[in-house]
């Protein structure tokens, strides 16, 4: 069976407030994640909300990586969607553990666009 894409949905709970408010750090961490996944960034957009929170999107040649933070809820949502390859979610979680402070992670792996 063939699919058009692979979608990894990552929810991080119990995140560090100060780290989530450090948008420069989050942006660099996201770019490093894209490089670690061996993807090519073709566009990017970032927005800082007030009084807090941040959203960012990297358009990669394979699709996209997005992040949304809710410091007031100690939560981060990350989506990685690609049309070219599946990623090892364990390696991605290991990368996130090295670069972010959080207490709990939930992951959903979704195969998208089934082709008969």
Swiss-Prot record:
> Would you say which domain of life the source belongs to?
Bacteria
> Which residues catalyse the reaction?
63, 68, 83
> What cystine pairs are annotated?
none
Q: How is it modified after translation?
A: Is synthesized initially as an inactive proenzyme. Formation of the active enzyme involves a self-maturation process in which the active site pyruvoyl group is generated from an internal serine residue via an autocatalytic post-translational modification. Two non-identical subunits are generated from the proenzyme in this reaction, and the pyruvate is formed at the N-terminus of the alpha chain, which is derived from the carboxyl end of the proenzyme.
Provide the catalytic activity annotation.
S-adenosyl-L-methionine + H(+) = S-adenosyl 3-(methylsulfanyl)propylamine + CO2
Q: Which Gene3D superfamilies match?
A: S-adenosylmethionine decarboxylase
CC annotations in GO: cytosol
| Record carries keyword Transport | no
Q: In which pathway does it act?
A: Amine and polyamine biosynthesis; S-adenosylmethioninamine biosynthesis; S-adenosylmethioninamine from S-adenosyl-L-methionine: step 1/1
What InterPro entries does UniProt report for this protein, alphabetically? Answer: AdoMetDC_fam_prok, S-AdoMet_deCO2ase_core, S-AdoMet_deCOase_pro-enz
Task: Write down the Pfam families for this protein, in alphabetical order.
Answer: AdoMet_dc
Which residues are recorded with the post-translational modification Pyruvic acid (Ser)? 63
EC number(s) stated in the UniProt entry for this protein: 4.1.1.50
Protein family per UniProt: Belongs to the prokaryotic AdoMetDC family. Type 1 subfamily.
The record describes the protein's role as:
Catalyzes the decarboxylation of S-adenosylmethionine to S-adenosylmethioninamine (dcAdoMet), the propylamine donor required for the synthesis of the polyamines spermine and spermidine from the diamine putrescine.
Q: What is this protein called?
A: S-adenosylmethionine decarboxylase proenzyme
What lineage is this protein's organism placed in? Answer: Bacteria, Bacillati, Bacillota, Clostridia, Eubacteriales
